């Protein structure tokens, strides 16, 4: 499960209280899924705990078994959706020809995910104002993972060895930014072949515009 689970939720921590049974885990999952729909459709300000519990099919009191507030739920949801993205693109790194092929496959999987979870854009964007730390964490951890993969690729000779760690960090942020807006353009605003989009973007990564 993508939500960050701890023994006790602290105000503003974005943590859900620990489910102690499989049934509790399923209930927490229902609340998170209902929150994604509610926040995605109505936005944070216009969403309500009552609306979320009605969507989830749980009692109002059940909500407070897991979360202290709407803000705490939103924070947990942002981290949960970040975890879902990680889990979705994970298979891209198994069996890829090289690091850049893995990035191509990861982008294709992300584009498919974004097409099926279009509300992720509204939720992540709103988190900049509702929970700036979660918003920053979402992007920083993503870029950090990309940069780490590129450093490993440099050691294998799959990207230029003269690129410094700082260079690869810049590349990681540029790559992530491109992926975010490709998802917005070709999965949210319009529907395009994810493989085709990923192939074209990967060509830019491999060769640039000059070749």
Where are these regions (language model features)?
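Conserved hydrophobic residue
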Residues: 44-45, 159-160
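Key DNA-contact positions within bacterial/archaeal DNA-binding proteins
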Residues: 61
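Hydrophobic alpha-helical connector segments
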Residues: 76, 87-119, 165, 171-175, ...
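Basic, helix-initiating cap at the start of DNA-binding domains
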Residues: 1-42, 49-55, 72
């Amino acid at each position: 499960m993508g939500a960050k689970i701890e023994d006790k939720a602290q105000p503003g921590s974005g943590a859900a209280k620990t489910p102690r049974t499989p049934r509790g885990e399923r209930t927490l999952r229902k609340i998170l899924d209902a929150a994604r729909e509610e926040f995605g459709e109505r936005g944070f300000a216009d969403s309500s705990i009552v609306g979320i519990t009605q969507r989830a099919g749980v009692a109002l009191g059940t909500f407070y078994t897991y979360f202290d507030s709407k803000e705490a739920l939103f924070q947990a949801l942002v981290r949960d959706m970040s975890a879902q993205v990680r889990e979705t693109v994970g298979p891209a790194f198994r069996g890829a020809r090289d690091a850049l092929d893995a990035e191509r496959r990861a982008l294709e999987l992300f584009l498919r995910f974004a097409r099926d979870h279009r509300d992720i854009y509204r939720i992540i964007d709103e988190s900049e104002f509702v929970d700036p730390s979660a918003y920053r964490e979402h992007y920083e951890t993503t870029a950090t993972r990309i940069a780490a993969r590129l450093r490993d690729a440099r050691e294998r000779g799959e990207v230029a060895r003269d690129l410094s760690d700082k260079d690869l960090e810049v590349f990681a942020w540029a790559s992530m930014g491109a992926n975010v807006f490709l998802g917005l353009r070709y999965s949210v605003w319009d529907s395009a072949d994810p493989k085709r989009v990923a192939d074209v973007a990967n060509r830019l990564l491999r060769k640039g515009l000059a070749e």
